[in-house]
Amino acid sequence: MAKFEKVKIAGQELNIKFGFNALAVFEKESGESISGLGNYGENIPIRVAICLVYAGLKDGARISKSEFKLTKEDVADLLDEDGQALNRVMKVFSDMMGDKKKAVRK
């Protein structure tokens, strides 16, 4: 089974994964290229951040065979409730993308 993480957002433990499928969902939902994310640094636009979290949660649910009913608006509401959630999600994103870079170099 593919690797996913659990992340706590607004008191809920949610499955999250940033693989190729999540990145494709992100690009489709946001209209942004994944390669452009690095250009934002710490100033990622809210719309882009919501789409990134949404894509990771959607793919985490898919991989873990869990039901996924959240909309992007629901994700935004969860982020409103938990001021540190975006930081936790971005850490998972960085860790998972770092794992992919290491695997490619081997």
Can you say where each PLM-predicted feature lies in the sequence?
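Short, hydrophobic/amphipathic alpha-helical patches that form generic packing surfaces
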Residues: 48-59, 91
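Charged interaction scaffolds used for protein-protein
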Residues: 1-10, 24, 28-47, 64-106
